[in-house]
């Protein structure tokens, strides 16, 4: 695996104050399955936070599957994203989706957030 395709701690939102900043001042992107809160950051790379609640997915196995897919798609697209903080929240409809549909939905969001010059 290439060094720039990992998922180090530096590209995650880890502290409550980081989440508060995003929830307090963010623009929203949504579809039938997900809501993304996006806020510009002062760093040089995008950072990801997850807020997958029991309201969205009742069973822990479903919440973990959703989180795993979000982390994986973010990791694959991170180098093309603008320097933003992103918090991903899901909607109850997503629990009935298969992995391919979840990936497709998330990839549309990452494409919207990608920097114009990152795609040659």
Swiss-Prot record:
Enzyme class: hydrolase
Known EC number: 3.1.26.5
Pfam annotation, one family: Ribonuclease_P
Keywords, in A-Z order: Endonuclease, Hydrolase, Nuclease, RNA-binding, tRNA processing
Transmembrane segments: none
Gene Ontology molecular function: 3'-tRNA processing endoribonuclease activity; ribonuclease P activity; tRNA binding
UniProt similarity note: Belongs to the RnpA family.
Binding partners and assembly: Consists of a catalytic RNA component (M1 or rnpB) and a protein subunit.
GO biological process: tRNA 5'-leader removal
Cellular component aspect of the GO annotation: ribonuclease P complex
Name of the featured protein: Ribonuclease P protein component
Function in brief: RNaseP catalyzes the removal of the 5'-leader sequence from pre-tRNA to produce the mature 5'-terminus. It can also cleave other RNA substrates such as 4.5S RNA. The protein component plays an auxiliary but essential role in vivo by binding to the 5'-leader sequence and broadening the substrate specificity of the ribozyme.
InterPro entries: Ribosomal_Su5_D2-typ_SF, Ribsml_uS5_D2-typ_fold_subgr, RNase_P
Catalyzed chemical reaction(s): Endonucleolytic cleavage of RNA, removing 5'-extranucleotides from tRNA precursor
